[in-house]
Amino acid sequence: DTHKSEIAHR
């Protein structure tokens, strides 16, 4: 996915 990195560091 694309937002995986986002949700990971959130």
UniProtKB/Swiss-Prot annotation:
Cell wall biogenesis/degradation as UniProt keyword: no
Task: Locate the residues binding Ca(2+).
Answer: 6
Domain of life according to the entry? Eukaryota
A GO cellular-component term linked to this record: extracellular region
Question: Where, per UniProt, does this protein localize?
Answer: Secreted
Tissue note: Expressed in placenta, specifically the maternal caruncula tissue (MCT) (at protein level).
Q: What keywords appear on the UniProt entry?
A: Calcium, Lipid-binding, Metal-binding, Phosphoprotein, Secreted, Zinc
Residue list for modification Phosphoserine: 5
Q: Does the keyword Acetylation apply?
A: no
Q: Which GO terms describe its molecular function?
A: lipid binding; metal ion binding
Q: How does it assemble?
A: Interacts with FCGRT; this interaction regulates ALB homeostasis. Interacts with TASOR. In plasma, occurs in a covalently-linked complex with chromophore-bound alpha-1-microglobulin; this interaction does not prevent fatty acid binding to ALB.
Protein family per UniProt: Belongs to the ALB/AFP/VDB family.
The protein's role, per its UniProt record: Serum albumin, the main protein of plasma, has a good binding capacity for water, Ca(2+), Na(+), K(+), fatty acids, hormones, bilirubin and drugs. Its main function is the regulation of the colloidal osmotic pressure of blood. Major zinc transporter in plasma, typically binds about 80% of all plasma zinc. Major calcium and magnesium transporter in plasma, binds approximately 45% of circulating calcium and magnesium in plasma. Potentially has more than two calcium-binding sites and might additionally bind calcium in a non-specific manner.
Annotated protein name in UniProt: Serum albumin
